[in-house]
Amino acid sequence: MNKPGTWISFVIIHVIFMGVWGALIELPEKNGFPATLGYVVWALTMIPATIVAMIINKWKLDYDKRSVLYGCLSGLLGAAGQLVLFYTLKTAPAYLVFPILSLTPVVTILLAVLFLKESTGMIGWAGIGIAILAIFLLSYVPPDNASASGYLWIILTIIPLVAWGAQGFVMRFANDTMKAESIFFYMTISSLALIPVALWMTDFSKPINYGLNGPYLAAGIQILNSFGALCLVYAFRYGKAIIIAPMTTALSPVLTVIISLIIYAVIPHIITVAGIALAILSALLMGNAESKMEKKTDIKAPKSALIK
């Protein structure tokens, strides 16, 4: 598998899968399949991807206390962010939400600066500054825009943003001592562990669509996420993080935005367009800065986008 150019194949698959997933994730909920049950389907689709990962790794699993702690903590942060994301997309369209979510490196970098006393350099700080401006612009919703109103959607979006950024920070330590397949395994276990919470949050007194465009459509969409995440694992394994991190951080949201705009058949306000563009630029800069920080500290590159 480790041939020249292998990593680019994994990057392309990851970008396509995650970009399409981001744009379509809200469709089952709009068809009457609750967002909380969408989380349940997502967690279950992690199982086949994990089986593939474990087969590739010949069923070897890191099971010391540190590995279990880092793996499960990473998984819980990712799963909690995912659970909130499903609800967030009930209040705002994907073309507004995902550009903000692409800014997860802001949190990862700030945590590294605060707790590890690392320096991010001018590129990182520029990315953070642009990110703040992007969020400010994206918070503007024209009065005639019925797809999003108020500021609740921004607050909800910040929750997975912080959770996934913290996940990336934790994974800096996990990647230093664990195989990627083991991290993936514990993430799946953690995701499955939150299923009872999702079921508890579900209002079963309301009609639920159990048809083809409900849970079955959700499964088809969520499998893109699980295998897209697995492709990212191997992209980092066979390629250079300083190239892969900016590409994957920036390109997936671009594809999500394009597809989402087509689905909604809207032309966003010029201020929104500027916010989207700045968010993507910020993600590109911070992905590059984050990779350089990893290289300086001799720690493997974090897969902060591993599970989303």
Enumerate the predicted regions with their spans.
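Juxtamembrane helix-loop boundary signature in multi-pass membrane transporters
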Residues: M1-I13, V106-V162, A274-K308
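Hydrophobic/small/kink-forming positions within alpha-helical transmembrane segments
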Residues: V15, G19, A23, I51, ...
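Alpha-helical transmembrane segments of compact multi-pass small-molecule transporters, enriched
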Residues: T45-A49, I100-L114, S190-L194, M247-I263, ...
